[in-house]
């Protein structure tokens, strides 16, 4: 009994630490997957960024069965597609989960993409970059004082439509 009392706290701490580590790796994978799905949505809904009927910026291509232009100047539809792909992240609609969409020139230097949403050019052969950040809260933080930390995921793809 004494041996159990001495070893049990260390054993359970180690056990739950391994579980938390696995959970954090899983969340990182889900963030990368969500960013990739958002970028995939953006690349197949590309088109000229400046068209009559759109104020400015990127928008999905007009569906073949519709005559209306579907504008997405702030990337809200890409953000929605990204959040929908984050199925394993429980609070993906909260402030802990943020998505940034950048449309940039395909010049090999996406780090210099200007502005909040890039340069607004979502034409063919331009790039779209989707960055996802999530504030991870360990489950054992109630027992052991562990801080939250920020995880990131991202995907950069070339627009082909």
Predicted regions and their residues:
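Low-complexity, S/T/G/P-rich flexible repeat/linker segments used as non-globular hinges
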Residues: 49-50, 131-161
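Amphipathic heptad-repeat coiled-coil/leucine-zipper-like oligomerization helices
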Residues: 93-99, 116, 126-134
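Disulfide-bonded cysteine motifs in exported proteins
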Residues: 65-66, 99, 107-108
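Short secondary-structure junctions
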Residues: 86-97, 140
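Sequence contexts marking disulfide-bonded cysteines in secreted/extracellular proteins
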Residues: 53-55, 70-72, 103-116
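Extracytoplasmic
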Residues: 123-127, 152
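Alpha-helical assembly-interface signal, strongest on the long, hydrophobic N-terminal helix that forms
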Residues: 1-81
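Short, P/G- and charge-enriched loop/turn segments at secondary-structure junctions
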Residues: 112-122, 140-143
């Amino acid at each position: 009994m004494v041996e159990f009392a001495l070893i049990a706290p260390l054993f359970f701490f180690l056990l739950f630490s391994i579980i938390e580590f696995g959970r954090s790796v899983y969340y990182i994978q889900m963030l990368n997957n969500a960013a990739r799905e958002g970028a995939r949505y953006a690349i197949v809904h590309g088109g000229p960024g400046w068209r009559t009927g759109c104020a400015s910026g990127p928008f999905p291509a007009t569906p073949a069965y519709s005559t209306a232009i579907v504008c997405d100047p702030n990337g809200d539809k890409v953000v929605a597609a990204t959040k929908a792909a984050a199925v394993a992240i429980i609070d993906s609609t909260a402030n802990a989960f943020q998505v940034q969409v950048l449309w940039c020139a395909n010049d090999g230097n996406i780090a210099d993409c200007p502005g909040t949403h890039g340069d607004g050019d979502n034409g063919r052969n331009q790039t779209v970059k989707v960055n996802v950040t999530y504030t991870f809260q360990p489950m054992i933080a109630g027992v052991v004082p562990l801080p939250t930390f920020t995880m990131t995921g991202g995907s950069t793809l070339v627009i082909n439509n």
